């Protein structure tokens, strides 16, 4: 209950989302004491081990007036962390780690921390890396991993295990998992990879196999839903600053200069939004969530003409599709062409320069920065604790700053688009003074 001077408001009960446990379909699953209780580096004070009563709320800010609806009842998730009893004997664990899809800063850090965490926290020594994504389960021999081997992987970009797109053959993958004797699967990838993880989880459950599956969501453009952010995003925003700085220098160094930067973003504009707020050098931020037009009152050309008259230069930023999928227009190349045609048509005798920068691969191929490295460690350890506790078919990630376990099928379906009604988009427009692109 929430009390005020004039009334009493009833806060609704919360609905705890179910995370599948091995005991749901293997009732005879045995438990073991958590070795962390005997680890000299940990002080297992009261509350150190979590239970089913520890939850994380999906929404920690509710509009009780009903103006902005929230799910009824509001959702809650199981809190991530170690449990007092575990459902795997560490000496019997055979863990597999796989990376799928495109590159993202922090992939190697997650691999490293999974290996070190399993080894040092739980005494698991049979840890294997799967090469080249999902197809690696049935096409390549697993690579034995240990802490010494992965010691400096967090300093490298990309993924040492290598990755690929496609190659998802459910029966071949699950058969290979059985044949190799894996009983823990750590799957690192984006939304497509998580959809594959759902199928693997369902097939393992159908076969009633004692195997836990956890997804660690990866997408550099931060389009994974439910969780606060995906790993690598902070690094991507930081690297985007270099491209913006270069575009700004090029623009101010020319007469009527325009710097055009195309950033990654598969139908979401999070990198562009945050990079704009961080740099303060961007005059117009174009994101997929907002339609814009070129000609006429309130259009992009009118805005740029005014900005060039006032400042003598402008910096534009747009987002593109990460996957390179041909159904997505290459907005950067198209916009560069349209800008050149506009200027030559309307100002044929005036100087004009446009410098186009596409830092896509620079952004996604670099090592994780300090913030993302720390984040990747927490994600990896949260995944390990959940799997050792017997949970399966889940994703780990922060919700409102608290780490939680989320059903993998929910994450596979959820999207995280920029909410243009949110105050952050208003901040972008206040920084850039750009039009709202509403036709008059």
Residue ranges and their predicted role:
Residues 260-267, 358-361, 397-404, 409:
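A glycine-rich phosphate-binding loop feature that marks nucleotide/adenosyl-phosphate handling sites
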Residues 1-98, 109, 120-126, 132-135, ...:
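N-terminal low-complexity/intrinsically disordered extensions
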Residues 378-392:
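Internal hydrophobic alpha-helix adjacent to the cofactor/substrate pocket in enzyme cavities
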Residues 347-365:
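Active-site pocket-lining segment
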Residues 104-114, 137-138, 168-173, 191-199, ...:
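Short glycine/serine/threonine-rich phosphate/pyrophosphate-binding segments
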Residues 176, 187-189, 195-204, 208-210, ...:
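Accessory alpha-helical/coil subdomains and C-terminal extensions
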Residues 100-102, 129-135, 165-166, 190-193, ...:
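Short, ordered loop/turn segments at secondary-structure junctions
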């Amino acid at each position: 209950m929430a009390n005020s001077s004039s009334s009493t408001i009833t806060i609704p009960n919360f609905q705890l989302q179910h995370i599948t446990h091995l005991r749901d379909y293997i009732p005879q699953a045995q438990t073991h004491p958590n070795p962390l209780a005997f680890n000299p580096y940990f002080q297992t004070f009261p509350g150190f081990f979590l239970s089913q009563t520890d939850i994380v709320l999906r929404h920690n800010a509710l509009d009780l007036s009903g103006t902005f609806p929230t799910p009824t009842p509001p959702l809650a998730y199981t809190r991530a962390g170690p449990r007092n009893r575990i459902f795997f004997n560490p000496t019997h664990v055979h863990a597999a780690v796989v990376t799928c899809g495109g590159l993202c800063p922090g992939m190697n850090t997650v691999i490293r921390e999974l290996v070190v965490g399993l080894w040092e926290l739980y005494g698991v020594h049979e840890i294997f890396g799967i090469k080249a994504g999902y197809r690696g389960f049935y096409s390549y021999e697993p690579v034995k991993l240990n802490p010494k081997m992965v010691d400096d992987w967090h300093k490298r970009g990309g993924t040492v295990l290598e990755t690929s797109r496609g190659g998802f053959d459910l029966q071949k993958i699950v058969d290979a998992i059985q044949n190799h004797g894996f009983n823990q699967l750590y799957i690192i990838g984006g939304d497509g990879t998580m959809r594959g993880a759902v199928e693997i989880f369902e097939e393992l459950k159908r076969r009633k196999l004692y195997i836990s599956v956890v997804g660690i969501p990866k997408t550099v453009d931060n389009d994974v839903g439910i969780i606060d952010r995906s790993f690598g995003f902070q690094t991507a925003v930081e690297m985007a600053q270099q491209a913006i700085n270069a575009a700004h220098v090029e623009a101010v160094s020319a007469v009527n200069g325009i710097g055009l930067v195309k950033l990654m973003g598969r139908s979401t504009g999070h990198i562009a939004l945050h990079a704009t707020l961080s740099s303060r050098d961007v005059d117009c931020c174009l994101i997929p969530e907002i339609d814009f037009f070129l000609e006429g009152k309130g259009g992009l050309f009118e805005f740029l003409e005014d900005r060039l008259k006032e400042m003598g230069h402008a910096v534009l930023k747009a987002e593109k599709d990460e996957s390179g999928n041909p159904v997505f227009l290459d907005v950067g190349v198209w916009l560069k062409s349209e800008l050149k045609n506009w200027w030559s048509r309307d100002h044929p005798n005036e100087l004009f320069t446009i410098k186009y920068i596409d830092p896509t691969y620079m952004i996604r191929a670099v090592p994780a920065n300090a913030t993302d490295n720390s984040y990747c460690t927490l994600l990896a350890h949260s995944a390990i604790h959940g799997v050792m506790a017997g949970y399966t078919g889940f994703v780990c990630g922060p919700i409102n700053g608290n780490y939680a376990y989320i059903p993998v099928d929910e994450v596979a379906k959820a999207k995280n688009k920029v909410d243009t009604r949110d105050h952050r988009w208003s901040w972008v427009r206040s920084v850039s003074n750009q039009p709202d692109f509403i036709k008059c």
